[in-house]
Amino acid sequence: MRLKGVLALFSFFTAIPIKSNASLEEIAEYSYISPLIIGISLALIESAVYVLLYRILEALAGIVLLGVVELLRGFNHLDGLLDLGDALMIKGDRERKIKALKDVEIGSGGIGLLLVYLSIQIVALLKLGFSFYTIFYLISSNVLSMTIGLYILSTISPIPESNLGKIFHNKLKGKSTVLLFELIPFISLYNIIVFLVFYMIMHKICRSLGGSSGDIAGASITLSFPLFLLTNEITNLNYSLLSILCYLFLHLH
């Protein structure tokens, strides 16, 4: 595994200032490990920031964390969410929807989907609270959301207009099983249901657009993160390997 390709994942998926001259093909080749490397790294940073903010702002720390979450991601996935929202609002043939997906202007559909995301995200972050489990909620949610975005790219053929989608699909189409195995320590019984339902919805959306794309993957990562986080908080990560390890740690020390 080349270090250059791994480090390039940080510059591609986040705003963390790591210089890399890796090509898009090299980034796509190693992207299957990004849920573990990038997802866990982001969760650790978010957890550290949240702990510091919570000491000052208490419950309101979640609102500030919203900005931190998007800032760490460089707002890249948020752009995909806005584009997908515009495409979903278009009535008519596929060409018009693709035009809206690739258009740089933001329409009412993009704003609407953004409001949906912000509503769920704010509720999830306000409910985060402060406990031993907080870091594990964030780790699980980051890993799961990144995985579902990449899993969509690996299992659904890209639209002809998406160069990024083609590159990632070619590099990931043999890695879908690996992506699912990476989930095992982090996914609970309840999040399996969320994962499957979310994937089926996105699969239907991809069919209406003619395939997957980088924008669709980015939108999936963005929108699924608060859903997984909220599920983790409500269920306390029950029936997951992480929850078992947490239980053993708390009761054996």
Curated annotation (Swiss-Prot):
Pathway: Cofactor biosynthesis; adenosylcobalamin biosynthesis; adenosylcobalamin from cob(II)yrinate a,c-diamide: step 7/7
Listed Pfam families: CobS
Keyword DNA-binding recorded: no
Top-level class of the enzyme under EC nomenclature: transferase
Transmembrane segments: 33-53, 56-76, 106-126, 132-152, 178-198, 209-229
Keyword Manganese listed: no
Any one GO BP annotation for this protein: cobalamin biosynthetic process
Keywords of this entry: Cell membrane, Cobalamin biosynthesis, Magnesium, Membrane, Transferase, Transmembrane, Transmembrane helix
Any one GO molecular-function label of the UniProt entry: cobalamin 5'-phosphate synthase activity
Catalytic activity reported: alpha-ribazole + adenosylcob(III)inamide-GDP = adenosylcob(III)alamin + GMP + H(+); alpha-ribazole 5'-phosphate + adenosylcob(III)inamide-GDP = adenosylcob(III)alamin 5'-phosphate + GMP + H(+)
Subcellular location(s) of the protein: Cell membrane
Sequence similarity: Belongs to the CobS family.
Function: Joins adenosylcobinamide-GDP and alpha-ribazole to generate adenosylcobalamin (Ado-cobalamin). Also synthesizes adenosylcobalamin 5'-phosphate from adenosylcobinamide-GDP and alpha-ribazole 5'-phosphate.
NCBIfam families named among the record's database cross-references: cobS (TIGR00317)
Protein name as annotated: Adenosylcobinamide-GDP ribazoletransferase
Gene source species: Saccharolobus islandicus (strain M.16.4 / Kamchatka #3)
Lineage of producing organism: Archaea, Thermoproteota, Thermoprotei, Sulfolobales, Sulfolobaceae
